[in-house]
A protein has these predicted regions:
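Glycine-rich, Trp-frequent "lid" loop and neighboring beta-strands that shape
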Residues: 52, 61, 68-109
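Alpha-helical interface subdomain recognition
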Residues: 1-69, 115-257
Length: 257
């Protein structure tokens, strides 16, 4: 079986990487206004991929790259059919400063599509945390050698790499199941969100440790990726709850949480 992206998907992924890197570099003014450049997304065709005979798998690829760049716009809400609404007469305190939060209408529930989308974005966040950790481990010198030569550092990066690749496989599987309306869509999406969002949080925590002191400060962008990862993990059903859902589906009985 061929699990590689096809030519169109690879071109779309590369286009997203290039566009996002130019619009949302790591050294951007994080504290200033965050322009979602929605009109540019429309020009790129990302707001209506169906017009190009593409589907949710391609949207998931875009979300992965948006997670990597910490894109500030509501693309996830757009592709999952979620509606942003303001709470009446209240203030919503945000944790992830790169993404304002909104209240969901009463009765809103996570769909497999939403879970798969969040998993895809989490993969991008985890990959960026890993890449930042690798870059620092290669260039930061300690006792005359790059810190990446020490097992305490290199093994953390190796573990993160394994987690990211597993998360990506689950996210792509979930995206395909949702796109094809496969009977395993609910199970795949639950598994993907549980593993990928947790992997993103752990990837950020490990990368912060690899960076040492600077990783714990607001001077470095890592804390923003960490907050996005925590947001993805904590929105809706958490990994522990998703595991109960998965066990229920596998065993056909209600599992005690």
């Amino acid at each position: 079986m061929d699990f590689a992206l096809n030519e169109i998907q690879q071109e779309l992924k590369e286009q997203a990487q290039s566009w996002l890197a130019s619009r949302y570099p790591l050294d951007r003014d994080w504290d200033g206004p965050q322009d979602d450049r929605w009109s540019e997304l429309e020009e790129l065709g990302w707001l209506d991929v169906a017009a190009a005979d593409l589907g949710f798998v391609e949207e998931a690829l875009l979300l992965e790259e948006m997670g990597y760049a910490l894109y500030p716009g509501p693309y996830l809400a757009h592709v999952t059919g979620q509606t942003d609404v303001f709470g009446a007469g209240g203030t919503i305190e945000t944790v992830d400063s790169t993404r304002p939060l909104r209240r969901l209408p009463n009765g809103s529930a996570e769909t497999p599509r939403l879970r798969a989308a969040m998993a895809a974005e989490a993969v991008g966040v985890a990959q960026r945390a890993l890449d930042l950790g690798i870059e620092h481990a290669k260039t930061r010198m300690q006792f005359g050698k790059p810190i990446g030569t020490y097992q305490a550092v290199s093994h953390q990066l190796a573990d993160t790499y394994t987690d990211v690749e597993l998360a990506r496989s689950l996210a792509y599987w979930a995206a395909w199941c949702v796109a094809e309306d496969d009977e395993q869509a609910s199970l795949a999406a639950a598994a993907a969100k549980a593993f990928a969002t947790e992997a993103a949080v752990v990837a950020c925590e490990r990368s912060i440790q690899v960076h040492g002191g600077i990783g714990f400060t607001w001077e470095h962008a890592l804390h923003r990726f960490y907050k996005r990862a925590l947001w993805l993990e904590g929105f809706g059903a958490r990994p522990s709850q998703l595991r109960v859902e998965i066990a229920d589906a596998l065993l056909g009985v209600a599992v005690t949480a």
